[in-house]
From Swiss-Prot:
<keyword id="KW-0813">Transport</keyword>
<comment type="function">
    <text>Serves as a slightly cation selective porin. Major antigen on the gonococcal cell surface and it may have pathogenic properties in addition to its porin activity.</text>
</comment>
<comment type="similarity">
    <text>Belongs to the Gram-negative porin family.</text>
</comment>
<dbReference type="InterPro" id="IPR001702">
    <property type="entry name" value="Porin_Gram-ve"/>
</dbReference>
<dbReference type="Pfam" id="PF00267">
    <property type="entry name" value="Porin_1"/>
</dbReference>
<feature type="signal peptide">
    <location>
        <begin position="1"/>
        <end position="19"/>
    </location>
</feature>
<keyword id="KW-1134">Transmembrane beta strand</keyword>
<dbReference type="InterPro" id="IPR033900">
    <property type="entry name" value="Gram_neg_porin_domain"/>
</dbReference>
<dbReference type="GO" id="GO:0034220">
    <property type="term" value="P:monoatomic ion transmembrane transport"/>
</dbReference>
<dbReference type="InterPro" id="IPR002299">
    <property type="entry name" value="Porin_Neis"/>
</dbReference>
<keyword id="KW-0732">Signal</keyword>
<keyword id="KW-0812">Transmembrane</keyword>
<keyword id="KW-0472">Membrane</keyword>
<dbReference type="GO" id="GO:0046930">
    <property type="term" value="C:pore complex"/>
</dbReference>
<dbReference type="InterPro" id="IPR013793">
    <property type="entry name" value="Porin_Gram-ve_CS"/>
</dbReference>
<keyword id="KW-0626">Porin</keyword>
<dbReference type="GO" id="GO:0015288">
    <property type="term" value="F:porin activity"/>
</dbReference>
């Protein structure tokens, strides 16, 4: 059996050399714990005696137990390659797949960034499941590894990161500047989806309202502009969809940790556009990144929605240890032309990576996320994780 395996490996080596195929990936997992804290403030009427009824405030607080589990932190495996076609032209391809060392996970190949394309002096043209410009920019602002992409990563801030089935063009670099454009056809955009839920009637009986699947949104357009000069780097990312299936409900779903395509499409909007500006500086062991994001949309009744957010990450290498901290803040949002009072959120993630070697590291982090949901109301998530990461 060993002889057969050896022969198979040796016979594959010349093929790999000719085709220029690379195998790469990351295996990362660990132990995570989290709990939720809620506060609900309600105004109620009470009997005030001779003065009649008066309003009193009822404050309800709830706290979940700490839930601990062994989780995969986003392991994946990938293959990529290229072929020289002559005259400076190359064929390029990549196939990436999520894997899980904690069991379960994806059931189909190519569920991460996977594409085929051409590269040359004109730039690079790719078609397939290609990361958008927001996903590119997030590599600097959110380097955290975790199974909890809402609290232990900047999941709310990164809700527009995606790898849609699309075609993307990246230009060559000119004096430090480069750009890109990306097109997602309507057939590949996400469908509007309202999940099933229960409602109470006057007799307090629960009635199930079934899920509703709507039509896809519209074509989606992305664009990006990059600049790099020494240790300084900047990125601008833009998204536009005339009819979009992301909105207020999707924002809430991201808060509770849902990451499926269906969960992202629950509130059809018009003229949805997102702008994100990211800047970074790297010198020696110091890494700094700042980002600001503006999310704009319209409703069917012509009223407007908007959210404004900022995020920052800083790290510094001390020998084998890299301590890091991130902060994100979302200002009170505007919904249907009206400002939502006390609807902001704050998030802090702190941790350290310790490198045993160039490819293997221990990763430790703690996270705190508080989302205000009205005057006197909030949802808070506390999380911590410790794990191991190996790159190959």
């Amino acid at each position: 059996m060993r002889k057969k395996l050896t022969a198979l490996v040796l016979s594959a080596l010349p093929l790999a050399a000719v085709a220029d195929v690379s195998l790469y990936g990351e295996i990362k997992a660990g132990v995570e714990g989290r709990n939720y804290q809620l506060q609900l403030t309600e105004a109620q009427a009470a009997n005030g005696g001779a003065s009649g009824q008066v309003k009193v405030t009822k404050v309800t607080k709830a706290k979940s137990r700490i839930r601990t589990k062994i989780s995969d932190f986003g392991s994946f495996i990938g293959f990529k390659g290229s072929e020289d076609l002559g005259d400076g032209l190359k064929a390029v391809w990549q196939l990436e797949q999520d894997v899980s060392v904690a069991g379960g996970g994806a059931t189909q190949w190519g569920n991460r960034e996977s594409f085929i394309g051409l590269a040359g002096e004109f730039g690079t043209l790719r078609a397939g499941r290609v990361a958008n410009q927001f996903d590119d920019a997030s590599q600097a602002i959110d380097p955290w590894d975790s199974n909890n992409d809402v609290a232990s990563q900047l999941g709310i801030f990164k809700r527009h990161d995606d790898m849609p089935v699309s075609v993307r063009y990246d230009s060559p670099e000119f004096s430090g500047f480069s750009g890109s454009v990306q097109f997602v056809p309507i057939q590949n955009s996400k469908s509007a989806y309202t999940p099933a839920y229960y409602t109470k009637n006057t007799n307090n009986n629960l009635t199930l309202v079934p899920a509703v699947v709507g039509k896809p949104g519209s074509d989606v357009y992305y664009a990006g502009l990059n600049y790099k000069n020494g240790g300084f780097a900047g990125n601008y990312a833009f998204k536009y969809a005339r009819h979009a299936n992301v909105g207020r409900n999707a924002f809430e779903l991201f808060l509770i940790g849902s990451g499926s395509d269906q969960a992202k499409g629950t509130d059809p909007l018009k003229n949805h556009q997102v702008h994100r500006l990211t800047g970074g500086y790297e010198e020696g062991g110091l890494n700094l990144a700042l980002a600001a994001q503006l999310d704009l949309s319209e409703n069917g009744d012509k009223t407007k929605n908007s959210t404004t957010e900022i995020a920052a990450t800083a790290s510094y290498r001390f020998g084998n240890a890299v301590p890091r901290i991130s902060y994100a803040h979302g200002f009170d949002f505007i919904e249907r032309g009206k400002k939502g009072e006390n609807t902001s959120y704050d998030q802090i993630i702190a941790g350290v990576d310790y490198d045993f070697s160039k490819r293997t590291s221990a990763i430790v982090s703690g996270a705190w996320l508080k989302r205000n949901t009205g005057i006197g109301n909030y949802t808070q998530i506390n999380a911590a994780s410790v794990g191991l990461r190996h790159k190959f």
